[in-house]
């Protein structure tokens, strides 16, 4: 089941095990059970620390990752390959006794949860943001015996996942808990546990504090650290929106990579320098005083710095039409790579004729029954090579000069209405899912009245990446820089860093 290269990598990782692990498998006579049995046997053959026993569990096929004679609460229902294979390997290492790479303060928060908490996460194996949630809840299960977690592959357990329209979908004790990417800190916050503000209030002032974790932030942090400046990053997650990007083929010198790989490499590069990286928390306010620039965090802690670089990126732009908000995660989606498999053999729409929209339509055409692409303009805006590929597909329709007006459906999406801009006629297309790909909205709601924003909510900067407030700089997709590309954001981050350094020298 595992190819030679993957086996070699796995062999090296399993050598890091620090104790014994027992797979407790619930298997039937079906094909998926046979596939799971083959996978578990292959892994057991690679390490003397792994044994397999069979036992009836809640779902078949499934298996728990336990210590001999001790249940950890970690279960995989289905076959955790694809993006979830890393989740399985990490669970094995942590259950074996390998210390988690998590801050002690977070570990203490997890230990302090009283519970019991029984989590279930529905995933698709092509979902790039699902492993973050699975790995976070698995870690919590390893640390706290009052927590259990089951990963459920929706493609295997279709009856259970029939009404799941977006992944990851997390349930706590049978009730919906959350959708989309969540960090350990996000989960802890939803459970009522917050980071101690004193952990942040006791920090010495920075020379440069970078707010955000994407490509611009990473670039800025590395450049300022190399200048010998005391540098800090405060961010929800390293990689930012790039984490949700499937393929990256235009980052020069790297022919092809994925968003998750890029983000992982960025985090590793940042870790090579003396940079105080604070993740899992967001900024809520910024103000300049006579002595310093003060950044307030969501736990009310305050960080001080001589300069600040704002690089909080952007989020998916919504259609803002009736029915959309009500049916998000119920047929309205934003990530085709994550949620596409949930619409296998169904009819879907993609809204947006730029590169992202056309790429989404191409990817979805290989999974779903039919794709209808809507573009407001009179022609598509995507690169010609993508348009040619799209038009060659037999199960794709393209509607230009189409203004979407309403998402239709009661409990779930059943259609979309649009106006033909050439005729003025209103029409309805019956379908099961809608993927919105119409660009991004800058994450600047926390900056109102702090720095100058344009009519689109973007931070206005000059050629030095400086804002209208001395000492506050900005870079990346959060700014009014016209073109939004990873490579451009990284250059902007470096430019902001060098000009922040120059500002410190002169002030």
Swiss-Prot record:
Q: Which cysteines are joined by disulfide bonds?
A: 335-338
Gene3D superfamilies named among the record's database cross-references: 3.40.30.80, FAD/NAD(P)-binding domain (3.50.50.60)
Entry keyword annotation includes Oxidoreductase: yes
Give the enzyme's EC designation.
1.8.1.-
Give the Gene Ontology MF terms in alphabetical order: flavin adenine dinucleotide binding; NAD binding; NADH-dependent peroxiredoxin activity; oxidoreductase activity, acting on a sulfur group of donors, NAD(P) as acceptor
Keyword terms: Disulfide bond, FAD, Flavoprotein, NAD, NADP, Oxidoreductase, Redox-active center
Q: What note does UniProt attach to the cofactor annotation?
A: Binds 1 FAD per subunit.
Any further remark recorded for this protein: The active site is a redox-active disulfide bond.
Summarizing the function annotation, the protein's role is: Serves to protect the cell against DNA damage by alkyl hydroperoxides. It can use either NADH or NADPH as electron donor for direct reduction of redox dyes or of alkyl hydroperoxides when combined with the AhpC protein.
Q: What is this protein called?
A: Alkyl hydroperoxide reductase subunit F
In its UniProt entry, the species of origin is given as Staphylococcus epidermidis (strain ATCC 35984 / DSM 28319 / BCRC 17069 / CCUG 31568 / BM 3577 / RP62A)
Upper classification of the organism: Bacteria, Bacillati, Bacillota, Bacilli, Bacillales
Q: Which gene encodes it?
A: ahpF
């Amino acid at each position: 089941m595992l190819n030679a290269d993957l086996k070699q990598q796995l062999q090296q990782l399993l050598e890091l095990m620090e104790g014994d692990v027992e797979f407790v498998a619930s298997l039937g006579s079906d094909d998926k059970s046979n596939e799971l049995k083959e996978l578990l046997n292959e892994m057991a053959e690679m390490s003397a620390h792994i044994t397999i026993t069979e036992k009836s569990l809640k779902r078949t096929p499934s298996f728990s990752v336990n210590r001999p004679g001790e249940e950890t609460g970690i279960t995989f229902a289905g076959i955790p390959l694809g993006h979830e294979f890393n989740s399985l390997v990490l669970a094995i290492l942590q259950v074996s006794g390998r210390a988690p790479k998590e801050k002690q303060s977070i570990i203490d928060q997890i230990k302090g949860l009283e519970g019991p908490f029984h989590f279930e996460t529905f995933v698709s194996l092509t979902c790039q943001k699902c492993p973050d949630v699975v790995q976070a809840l698995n870690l919590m299960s390893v640390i706290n015996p009052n927590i259990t977690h089951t990963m459920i592959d929706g493609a295997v357990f279709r009856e259970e996942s029939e009404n799941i329209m977006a992944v990851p979908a997390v349930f706590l004790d049978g009730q919906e808990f959350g959708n989309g990417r969540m960090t350990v800190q996000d989960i802890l916050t939803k459970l009522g546990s917050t980071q101690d503000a004193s952990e942040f209030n006791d920090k010495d002032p920075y020379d440069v504090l970078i707010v955000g974790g994407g490509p611009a932030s990473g670039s800025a942090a590395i450049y300022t650290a190399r200048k010998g400046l005391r540098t800090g990053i405060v961010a929800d997650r390293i990689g930012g929106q790039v984490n949700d990007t499937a393929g990256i083929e235009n980052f020069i010198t790297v022919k092809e990579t994925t968003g998750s790989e890029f983000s992982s490499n960025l985090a590793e590069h940042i870790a090579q320098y003396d940079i105080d990286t604070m993740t899992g928390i967001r900024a809520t306010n910024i103000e300049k005083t006579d002595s310093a620039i003060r950044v307030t965090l969501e736990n009310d802690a305050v960080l001080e710095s001589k300069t600040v670089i704002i690089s909080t990126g952007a989020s998916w732009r919504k259609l803002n039409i009736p029915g959309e908000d009500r049916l998000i995660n119920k047929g309205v989606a934003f990530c085709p790579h994550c949620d596409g498999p949930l619409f296998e053999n169904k009819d879907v729409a993609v809204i947006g004729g730029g590169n992202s929209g056309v790429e989404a339509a191409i990817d979805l055409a290989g999974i779903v029954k039919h794709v209808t692409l809507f573009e407001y303009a009179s022609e598509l805006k995507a690169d010609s090579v993508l348009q040619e590929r799209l038009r060659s597909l037999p199960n794709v329709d393209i509607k230009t000069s189409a203004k979407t007006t309403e998402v239709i459906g009661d409990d779930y999406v059943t259609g979309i209405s649009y106006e033909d801009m050439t005729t003025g006629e209103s029409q309805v297309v019956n379908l099961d899912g809608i993927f919105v790909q119409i660009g991004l909205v800058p994450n600047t709601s926390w900056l109102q009245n702090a720095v100058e924003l344009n009519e689109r909510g973007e931070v206005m900067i000059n050629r030095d990446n400086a804002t209208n407030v001395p000492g506050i700089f900005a870079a990346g997709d959060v700014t009014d820089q016209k073109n939004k590309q990873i490579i451009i954001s990284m250059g902007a981050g470096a430019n902001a860093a060098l000009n922040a350094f120059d500002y410190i020298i002169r002030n």
